[in-house]
Amino acid sequence: MKEKIKKLYSLQLREGGIADDVFHFLPEDEQDMLDEIKGRFFLRPEFRKRIKVVLTGGVFDILHIGHIHTLNEAKKHGDLLVVAVATDSHIEKKKRKTIHSQEYRAAMVEFLKPVDVALLGKAKPKDLLEFVGPDVIVYGYDQEPFIKPEGVEVIKLSKQVEGEKFKTSKIIEELGV
């Protein structure tokens, strides 16, 4: 049952609701877990409550062992790991540059073993939280918990890989990019 719920919630997150043409191909027992809202289908709350959704995020411009470690640790805190990948516009606002586009970075993260869903961040953190509805938010060792919603467990990882700090900016500097 839990695997079916995870599958349906993942579909819902990737597409902003499950489209009618996808809904009709789902087995009847899975269709019964969904409610129609404005022409799209969403997991009913009584089923959503049966899984623990973990949200984490980052830029993920040059993937390295520190990212993998953080994602593996985040996954341990729930059933479904959702990773918000920072948008290009968000990064530009912080006066930073990326090597890879937001779409490329999201696709790379989506293929990592611990990740169930990778999606682009939203302009406002509140909108992302409303969209994902996490039970847990995990921040990496080098991230400051900037949002702590009521009723959501917030975890800050302190563990680093082999005591070393892996930073994309240091890797870029070493590569001379």
How does the language model describe each region?
Residues 1-177:
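Nucleotidyltransferase catalytic core that binds NTPs
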